[in-house]
């Protein structure tokens, strides 16, 4: 793997902040901002991409009435949910599942972010099955779909993407295949 200067600096920064007592939720937000704040990190509507994970984490937070470990994991994963998938484009370097582990995020958060990340071998049905079987990933995907299909964002969606999101809703929320 080529030298990853920015990624390695980010890992060290997060490790140092964690050592000084920063919470996972704050650290997840810092990582998301670092990865999604470059000049390439603009969504299809011309809005800075960081606003998407901010909204997704807010939706996750609104789903809970009392603090729990599930909420904490889902909130952190919501901030991080596109970091692995989009880091090469937005950050200029890959951020991997192993990098998130090195930063100290717990296994449930790291696993959920990994499950939510599409790779080059992405097969939709397998992707949805993996998410459906992970409580944290499913909550984050619900919040992600809620944001992606909101009137604020959906005006910039093409028909293929709208159809794909409907399939995701059907499978993950309504438990219907097809």
Functional labels for PLM-detected ranges:
Residues 1-178:
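Active-site helical microenvironments for divalent-metal-assisted chemistry
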């Amino acid at each position: 793997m080529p030298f990853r200067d920015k990624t390695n600096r980010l890992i060290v920064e997060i490790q140092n902040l964690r050592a000084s007592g920063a919470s996972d939720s704050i650290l997840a937000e810092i990582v998301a901002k670092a990865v999604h704040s470059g000049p390439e990190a603009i969504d299809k509507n011309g809005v800075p991409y960081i606003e998407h994970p901010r909204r997704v984490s807010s939706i996750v937070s609104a789903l809970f009435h009392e603090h729990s470990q599930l909420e904490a994991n889902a909130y952190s994963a919501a901030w991080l949910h596109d970091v692995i998938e989009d880091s090469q484009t937005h950050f200029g370097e890959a951020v991997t599942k192993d990098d998130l582990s090195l930063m100290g995020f717990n296994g449930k958060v790291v696993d959920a972010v990994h499950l939510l990340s599409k790779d080059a071998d992405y097969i939709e049905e397998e992707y949805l099955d993996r998410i459906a079987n992970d409580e944290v990933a499913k909550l984050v995907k619900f919040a992600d779909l809620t944001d992606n299909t909101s009137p604020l964002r959906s005006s910039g969606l093409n028909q293929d993407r709208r159809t794909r999101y409907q399939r995701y809703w059907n499978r993950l929320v309504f438990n219907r295949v097809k």
